[in-house]
Amino acid sequence: MEKRVRLYAFDYNEVRTYLWAALFVVCNMALPQVAHLVPQGGIIFAPLSLVILVGACKLGWKTALLAAVFSPLVNNIIFGMPAWDVLPIMAVKLAVLAIAAGLAVQRMQDVTLWLLCSVVLISEMLGGLAATIADFTIGWPGLLLQVVGGYLIVNRIWKW
């Protein structure tokens, strides 16, 4: 079976793991600024999740996990968002997204819409029932962006 996309799994002893994680953190500093041009844009679009999802699918869970932990922290230090009370919850949800997506892609050796739907649902359900309902009610555009946008980026745009 021919793979449609090249997938990588960088390890913590490789410099490129940290370079890519740093690039994802920078992307996760810029993307929320764009999302916040729309009122409630951070809640609606969940911009940090898209970068973590794409990173986990393309470069493995370890690279994405570094970005998942440091992105909210760096954003809080520089921009004051997310707020301190939300930061740990967001970091855990992003970390679960990074690990779930990275391990699922590593196991399946492919990135499909069903796989992305599954890992996004898993990470969303961590916040409890009320938070999950709120995420789906308010943030459905962001969830759709994660699944469809992540699929297109990994399978169509980022080919190498």
Map each language-model feature to its residues.
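Membrane-embedded alpha-helical hairpins and interfacial helices in multi-pass inner-membrane proteins
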Residues: 37-42, 65, 80-96, 103-160
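Detector for Asparagine
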Residues: 13, 28, 75-76, 155
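Helical-face signature of the major facilitator-like transporter fold
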Residues: 25, 68, 72-76, 94
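Hydrophobic transmembrane alpha-helices
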Residues: 2-58, 62-63
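Generic, low-specificity signal for short hydrophobic/alpha-helical stretches with a mild N-terminal bias
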Residues: 4-9, 16, 20, 33, ...
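Short, structured secondary-structure boundary patches
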Residues: 12-13, 56, 70, 85-90
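Alpha-helical transmembrane segments of multipass membrane proteins
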Residues: 29-33, 53-54, 73-77, 99-103, ...
